[in-house]
């Protein structure tokens, strides 16, 4: 049996698990009800995360049982961390966990992965490397939690991201465990998408926190294990996870900065994400998802090209130009007027919004000038 064949088992496992769960009483009680600060307009079961995680476990179990991959400590750490967040997310979907409890679960999952041996090797100082790994894992976990704000968005971006991690693990930096996990998450998401991204109807199932946190943590772990543990140029090792996951990073940064500037709590829900702003600009929900997925795929292809090229100067220049473009894109979206925007008087920080575009242009010029001297 091959890695791909073992991982492919995640697809029917996810499909069947979600189908079966929809027939249970949980489909009526574990639901996301419509709210003023949420995008959906009808109560929807929060069962998708169970299917995605079930697919991951089935694929990994088959791969280990058939000796496609060994039962390694790293594999156990990543799956164990995902398991912690799946359970915490499931409790949150049913009872609503306080933010500190969710953060504690995320910290425990990150500690388990780091204990298993997945570390940042591009930094020699162990304390700094551990701190960076924790920040990265928690950041990606919460980024996907925030990104799960429109039908099909989080699962589509996770599918694309995992596909590029798998390509890297099959070709550039061969690693069967990373390839298996990336494909397992990818196929698990593909089993979920028929329920969540339907052509002419709204989603019949959401992934919930039990799905979004698992996806974010899994992708963060894959980023650490597949790239940041590889010796070599710092730029080359950073390029894949940073570009493949640039859209979630952009969305989280945009939401955080704008809410702080407007004097609103960062943890408060809202209809002010990247996807929502694209809809306010005239796109349909599905076209917004397709556009962001296309951007993610283009960035993934770019990252692979840089890794194959293996030229630090060209890669650095390309990455700086890419992030300069993303800064401009984020600045443009931040200026989009929201129908339900707050009527409160602007805070001192909010007054800076008037000059945001000029500030971004200065930053972009600085990045490009700096890159020209590398």
List each model region and its residues:
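Signature of alpha-helical transmembrane segments in polytopic membrane proteins
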Residues: 5-6, 318-374
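Alpha-helical membrane-protein architecture signal
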Residues: 136-139, 271, 275, 356
């Amino acid at each position: 049996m091959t890695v791909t064949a073992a991982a492919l088992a995640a697809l029917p496992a996810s499909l069947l698990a979600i189908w079966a769960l929809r027939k249970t009483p949980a489909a009526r009680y574990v639901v996301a009800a419509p709210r003023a600060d949420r995008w959906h307009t009808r109560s929807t079961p929060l069962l998708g995360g169970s299917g995605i995680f079930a697919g991951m476990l089935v694929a990994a179990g088959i791969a280990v049982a058939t000796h496609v991959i060994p039962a390694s400590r790293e594999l156990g750490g990543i799956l164990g961390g995902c398991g912690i967040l799946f359970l915490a997310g499931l409790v949150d979907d049913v009872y609503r966990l306080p933010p500190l409890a969710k953060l504690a679960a995320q910290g425990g999952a990150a500690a388990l992965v780091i204990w298993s041996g997945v570390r940042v090797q591009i930094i020699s100082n162990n304390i700094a490397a551990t701190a960076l790994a924790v920040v990265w894992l928690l950041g990606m976990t919460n980024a996907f939690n925030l990104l799960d704000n429109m039908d099909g968005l989080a699962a589509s971006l996770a599918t694309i991201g995992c596909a590029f991690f798998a390509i890297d693990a099959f070709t550039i930096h061969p690693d069967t465990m990373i390839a298996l996990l990336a494909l397992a998450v990818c196929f698990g998401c593909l089993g979920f998408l028929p329920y969540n991204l339907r052509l002419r109807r709204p989603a019949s199932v959401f992934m919930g926190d039990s799905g979004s946190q698992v996806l974010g943590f899994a992708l963060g772990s894959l980023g650490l294990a597949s790239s940041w543990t590889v010796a070599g140029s710092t730029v080359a090792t950073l390029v894949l996870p940073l570009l493949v996951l640039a859209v979630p990073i952009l969305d989280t940064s945009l939401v955080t900065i704008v809410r702080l500037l407007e004097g609103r709590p960062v943890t408060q829900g809202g209809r002010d994400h990247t996807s929502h702003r694209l809809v306010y600009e005239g796109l349909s929900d599905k076209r917004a998802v397709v556009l962001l997925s296309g951007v993610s795929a283009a960035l993934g292809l770019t990252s692979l090209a840089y890794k194959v090229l293996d030229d630090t100067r060209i890669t650095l220049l390309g990455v700086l130009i890419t992030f300069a473009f993303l800064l401009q894109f984020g600045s443009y979206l931040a200026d989009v007027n929201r129908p339900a925007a707050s009527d409160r008087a602007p805070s001192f920080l909010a007054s800076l919004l008037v000059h945001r575009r000029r500030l971004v242009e200065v930053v972009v010029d600085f990045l490009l000038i700096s890159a020209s001297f590398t």
